[in-house]
């Protein structure tokens, strides 16, 4: 048995995200272009509970705007600040992630989880096409 306090002081919401096999969230659009989530009123604190998950992050305000972050159970929480494009990928065995989010005034779940395609966002597409991602593996 292993009991650890995994609290996030800032958290006021929690989501359990289960991929039972290989999965991409959000999935590519109908023409095969990558899609991302972008929360305007939520910071994510994603922690892998089981398996492994890789996150792709793009933030126009960062010095290095494109990151790929590989997480496992030992990684700790990946903080994804609001206004960061993000998507996640699980391998064949799937993964379970708990997101201990911080939601801000104005949060509306019907607007915060709409996939955004790089096919119709030229700025996002340009970053994915031209910038080399910074690759991180946390928890090794």
Give the residues covered by each predicted segment.
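Histidine-centered metal-chelating micro-motifs
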Residues: 75-87, 105-106
């Amino acid at each position: 048995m292993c009991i650890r306090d995994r609290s996030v002081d800032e958290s006021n919401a929690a989501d359990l995200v289960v991929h039972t096999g290989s999965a991409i969230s959000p999935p590519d659009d109908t023409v095969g272009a990558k899609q991302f989530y972008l929360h305007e009123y939520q910071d994510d604190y994603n922690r892998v509970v089981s398996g492994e998950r890789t996150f792709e992050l793009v933030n126009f305000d960062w010095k290095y705007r494109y990151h790929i972050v590989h997480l496992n159970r030992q990684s700790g929480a990946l903080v994804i600040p609001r206004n960061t494009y993000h998507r996640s990928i699980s391998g064949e065995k799937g993964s379970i992630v708990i997101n201990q989010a911080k939601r801000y005034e104005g949060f509306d779940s019907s607007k915060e989880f709409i996939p955004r395609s790089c096919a119709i966002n030229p700025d996002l597409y340009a970053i994915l096409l031209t910038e080399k991602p910074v690759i991180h593996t946390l928890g090794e």
